[in-house]
Amino acid sequence: MSGPLEGADGGGDPRPGESFCSGGVPSPGAPQHRSCPGPSLADDTDANSNGSSGNESNGHESRGASQRSSHSSSSGNGKDSALLETTESSKSTNSQSPSPPSSSIAYSLLSASSEQDNPSTSGCSSEQSARARTQKELMTALRELKLRLPPGHRGKGRSGTLATLQYALACVKQVQANQEYYQQWSLEEGEPCAMDMSTYTLEELEHITSEYTLRNQDTFSVAVSFLTGRIVYISEQAGVLLRCKRDVFRGARFSELLAPQDVGVFYGSTAPFRLPTWGTGTSAGSGLKDFTQEKSVFCRIRGGPDRDPGPRYHPFRLTPYVTKIRVSDGAPAQPCCLLIAERIHSGYEAPRIPPDKRIFTTRHTPSCLFQDVDERAAPLLGYLPQDLLGAPVLLFLHPEDRPLMLAIHKKILQLAGQPFDHSPIRFCARNGEYVTMDTSWAGFVHPWSRKVAFVLGRHKVRTAPLNEDVFTPPAPSPAPSLDSDIQELSEQIHRLLLQPVHSSSPTGPCGIGPLMSPRPLHSPGSSSDSNGGDAEGPGPPAPVTFQQICKDVHLVKHQGQQLFIESRARPPPRPRLLGKAKGLPCQSLDPELEVVPMPNQAPLALALEEAERKEASSCSYQQINCLDSILRYLESCNIPSTTKRKCASSSSCTASSASDDDKQRTGPVPVGAKKDPSSTVLSGEGASPRKEPVVGGTLSPLTLANKAESVVSITSQCSFSSTIVHVGDKKPPESDIIMMEDLPGLAPGPVPSPAPSPTVAPDPAPDAYRPVGLTKAVLSLHTQKEEQAFLSRFKDLGRLRGLDSSSATPSAPGCHHGPVPPGRRHHCRSKAKRSRHHHTPRAEAPCCVSHPSPVPPSGPWPPPPSTTPFPAVVQPYPLPVFSARGGPQPLPPAPTPMPPATFPTPLVTPMVALVLPNYLFPTPPSYPYGLSQAPVEEPPSPASHSPSPSLTPLTPSPPHHPDSPLFNSRCSSPLQLNLLQLEESPRTEGGAVAGGPGSSAGPPPPTEEAAEPEARLVEVTESSNQDALSGSSDLLELLLQEDSRSGTGSAASGSLGSGLGSGSGSGSHEGGSTSASITRSSQSSHTSKYFGSIDSSEAEAGAVQARIELGDQVIKYVLQDPIWLLMANADQHVMMTYQVPSRDRASVLKQDRERLRTMQKQQPRFSEDQRRELGAVHSWVRKGQLPQALDVMACVDCSSSIQDPGHSDDPLFSELDGLGLEPMEEGGGEGGGGGGGGGEGEGGEEAQAHIGVKVSSSQDSAMDEEEQGGSSSSPALPAEENSTS
């Protein structure tokens, strides 16, 4: 290996990558006998072909000659190739011939030459002389090659010529292999880095690099040729830093200046196609700093005035770039590696590293070998990163501290890899001094093998070494050897980490802790053991035996993972849990699945949960998905349905075991009891005649700092989160089915006495909330929040347990007893693959509508902090933004007048608020603004409908007005097909709807009017979102159906829903309103067969019959078989097909244009003065175009009147605020005012269509202006509605 490299530097010094022989004919003088004939052989071999054709041959024939495979089309090259091939074949056939090599080769060459020349060169004396000259040169080259052949290659019985040529070929290949660093550039000529480089002269390069070298006196620049490996340029500072003259570096190989152990690191880190290009955009303040941090390589460069005796190496940080440099004016530009070299000083010498910044990290294997070392360790320890890689960790520790590593690894195993602090250890620096460091350790547990894959260490220097220059070479001493104690400790640690981790800590690095046996462990953050003694306490758990593993597998396959999880994670007795707060990380603290605790236990449980919520999760999204995929595999096991039913009836919402079978049944729990909290929020009909207050705790302060706010985003599948594909997930995100009771800050305190009647909060500011378009930033932020929510909630996996017999006993419909335990949350992680019916119902007073744990406080809510990135929480229940559409609402007495208070911003993501504006407001009865709320004892009476604001309450639709069968979907995106696994629960034909406050449309049925509160509750429950998958799925259907009637949503796509903002639609019908109030019992299909534009001409004649048949159809599918059995036996009304019906685009657009033309009559008419005034403020009015905030293809909601705090400063929306159109809308204008919904028939309804359709005419833009104005002015409408009705 060394032979070719040595030869590369001697004997004329041919440069790799160039032509080996420049002259074409080597000197016939006495050859030099050297131990390495590599380059000389290459020169001679190259001469074999170069000399044959004169100047026509360039370096390509050298490779062909050396490989004996050159078949050139030219005659000269063909002859030379034939000569070599004939010589080779003749000598190989006569390999046993002992004839002298010279005579045999001469004979072969002459014969081959005569054979080749006879037919083609007769009569040409010039060609004959050329051939003779070529033959002579070839014989000379072969003779020289044979002289350079080592004696070991001259075997007996072998042809000398063949052996010589084979050895020459091997040497050429060896040289190419050793210089692969240079050959990479020629192989990567097609790479972009080779094409986009600028060419610099030496003067230009010196001028550019001086910008960096002059600012830092410890920096110099050097350019190394990729073709030769030699230095073509070096700055003046190099002589000062390396203590030698600058001329010493001229023409020297840069690799010769590096320390031998750093050469390979340098070559591996400076491959040309991996380097950034040095361009004009690189500046000293920006680009260089970034590349220095990411692309730097550490090497030691030799320096000193006399480099022969004991060379001294200085550590440098090299930042490589690739560029082209023209050495002289006539020379071609050659690619070079430009290096910015910065001298590394000890971190303890001036300029010192601040003590609080002396931190670095390491990673080592279970066998205690360094796997990765932070580059920040170089100035602190004196070692370059490559010095420690692969070295034993124990070798660098103080002998007295080495036993601590065994204790550290024991604690890592006990804590399942969770980070913890440990006592200081002493680490040996390069100069032989010891550095005292405070250490923190953590381990990565492999999600499948459950073993510690590697150990992470974070080290902070506490005490600097006595000799502050850590780069000083230590005194000569025998090389440190692995002592017997180091080997023994390494073996013990390795055997220890071979054991699988069985800790039950809920937040292990890979999330496997919750599946293990619940052993009480110390808190991961406990660092009370100053000397590591605590790690010796509880030894590592006994490994699971093979018999136990087989038993577990058998249990999972034949009896279900439900029973397996319960058998493996059976919780300890309750008193033990409350008595030992230290065992918090491994105990199951989910009060959702436990018996109702005693009142005196509430503060303790709340404190425990608060402490647990403060734990930092060290999981990563990909690690959690590894485990979740295993869980989903276990859930997919085919388990007998009888066993699964038994599990379903005895356990509610088990995160790690609820399978698809469980999603289809809720056991004996009645329909009214198994309400989803989300549907409860929307159930305004049952809440109106409430006569008993909800029993629950008071609200605790909102604390949103430790959990992503999007965890509680309500029905994210209706927002743009439905377009986000969760990695490794085939289920909807958890936030789709987790309501605001999952928020940590919403854990109620001690259960108080029955709360007084809810009070009304004042109306919010007109611009307190504003819909936001789907932007890249919002989408990215929401994705990050969803992933963070997924991580923060996955640690709750181990706190799940089955219900006790008391909590599993079915109760009367709508009646649940016992107070709400503190901290009640649905820990249905595993990415929402949970039963939608398994949401445990909220504890509430008998025969009362169940609500999430946050109950109306006696006083108004304080405004949330302004720093909250997302809205804080759903507004208090008695939020009477609008009066009932049914008619005049009698004002109840105001027993407790309340001072004005601002509404908190709703806890939903911006896009959820955009798509579901009505979801922001709960459903108790309607009351006017500014008045205290009292229970309404009578339902709203039928009367003519007053104009409705933009946030229209949901009210039942009369049976005579059919709805569109196209948008009956609970999902706005085909990416969430699994959201629609379970069809909606039965709905009565004229049943109540979970609508807005006091929602009613026309006279209610006599049975409903005379029903008791409990019966009314059952009706509300049956008409609610019974599947518990999406709290606002029916709301979305109503919005989409109204939009399908308005006919202006043809441009919207399915991912955002085609009815965004259609909630602003309203109309006045004497028989009942149909704009945004479609009864839930009128759903004909419950599934969407179409996600594109809305067919405005879709026939709706079959909707009434479908509404009548729906109750019987859906009842069959609520509490029975799993979804795949349902799909096999279901009829067309239940099946999800996603088949886009064939439609004529021209006809659809024509109908939409006709509707737009009819809606133009309802638009405001501006005079010329008004237009000038508007044009002075809004430029888009002058241009006759839509404003930028509205000129989007996606649907931008205009139905909400409360501004989003996160986008309150958006100039696009502030531009729309200035366009006040309230007088026009309230007055009705022509056609009754489209914005106010005062028109008759569908006119007012159409006027409220969403503005997602792109229109080009100025009249269409004026229509959108009026709609946006209606949105902004909507808060002023409700009071006027009451007065008018």
Curated annotation (Swiss-Prot):
Compartment(s) of residence: Nucleus; Cytoplasm
Pfam families: bHLH_PER (PF23170), PAS_3 (PF08447), Per3-like_PAS-A (PF21353), Period_C (PF12114)
UniProt-listed PROSITE patterns: PAS (PS50112)
Renumbered residue ranges of the record's region Interaction with BTRC: 1-151
Motif Nuclear localization signal, residue range(s) on this chain: 820-836
Ranges annotated as biased composition (Polar residues): 116-132, 967-979, 1269-1285
Residue ranges with Low complexity bias: 48-57, 64-115, 523-533, 648-658, 943-954, 1045-1055, 1071-1088
Designated name of the protein: Period circadian protein homolog 1
Gene, per the UniProt record: PER1
